[in-house]
Regions:
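Generic beta-strand/beta-sheet core signal
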Residues: 13-15, 100, 148-149, 179
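Conserved Switch II/interswitch segment of TRAFAC-class P-loop GTPases
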Residues: 116-130, 140-158
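A structural signal for isolated positions on well-ordered beta-strands in alpha/beta enzyme cores
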Residues: 11, 32, 96, 144-146, ...
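Conserved small/polar residues in nucleotide/adenosyl-binding loops
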Residues: 1-5
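A structured binding-face within diverse protein domains that lines the active/interaction site
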Residues: 133-137
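Nucleotide-state-sensitive switch-loop elements of NTP-binding domains
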Residues: 7-96, 102-132
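C-terminal lobe/tail of nucleotide-utilizing enzymes
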Residues: 138-142, 150-222
Length: 222
């Protein structure tokens, strides 16, 4: 919202099926919002493939196409292309993407690298948004990945794995955010105080991983 207040056009979107974004708040602030609905983009991609194939293929060939479209990787392709189209909007506005939890993000990252290599190898017919995706993500003047985690063992270890994969892919990450920190509250509950004390180990770990570039957000009762 601060970016929008400075006069920039902002597009907020999510790849997370859980979709925790507050759309009303964003719209009221003048921010464009969207989400990548896996079912919708899958059906749209299938229809695009069918339409293009029908121009040159026989009915028998179309049966093979339909069989191929039932492959699990078809959904990955559809989501990846939708992701690339969203990132391509950065030509005209600032795009903020809330990705799904770490495992889903890693799959998306792997798909991005794989597609980039395939496009380079085959020089095939692919959308411009796909061809430009990885170079844009690697451009530190255009892209910053902010890793968001919790002050707990598993989330921090998963986030560390994501950081390493980002580094391997040549994608910049400087800032981390640690959400729901009980250690920043004045709780008097003995159980929560013990939990808050345990958080300090993981907050310190994040500060090491981020080289001091970590923002801590206090736990709030929503």
């Amino acid at each position: 919202m601060c970016i929008r207040d400075r006069g920039a056009k902002v597009h907020l979107t999510t790849t997370d099926p859980a979709n925790h974004l507050n759309y009303n708040l964003a719209v009221q602030a003048g921010i464009t919002v969207s989400r990548i609905d896996e079912a919708e983009v899958l059906e749209a991609y299938k229809n695009e493939v069918r339409s293009k194939a029908a121009e040159t293929m026989t009915a028998e060939d179309m049966e093979y196409i339909e069989e191929d479209l039932r492959s699990p990787c078809t959904q990955e392709i559809a989501v990846f292309r939708a992701f690339a189209e969203i990132v391509d909007k950065a030509e005209n506005e600032i795009v903020v993407i809330d990705t799904a939890p770490t495992g889903h993000t890693l799959l998306l990252l792997d798909a991005t690298e794989s597609y980039h290599k395939e496009v380079q190898r085959t020089h095939g017919d692919s959308p411009a948004s796909v061809r430009k995706l990885l170079p844009r993500l690697r451009n530190q003047q255009e892209t910053e990945v902010v890793i968001v985690t919790l002050p707990e063992a598993t989330p921090v270890f998963e986030a560390e794995r994501l950081q390493k994969d980002l580094q391997r892919a040549g994608i910049n990450n400087k800032w981390w955010v640690v959400n729901a920190c009980l250690s920043l509250t004045d709780t008097e509950n003995s159980f929560l105080r013990a939990k808050a004390q345990n958080e300090l180990t993981w907050i310190k770990k994040v500060e090491e991983l981020s080289k001091g570039n970590a923002a801590l957000i206090a736990w709030k009762n929503n």
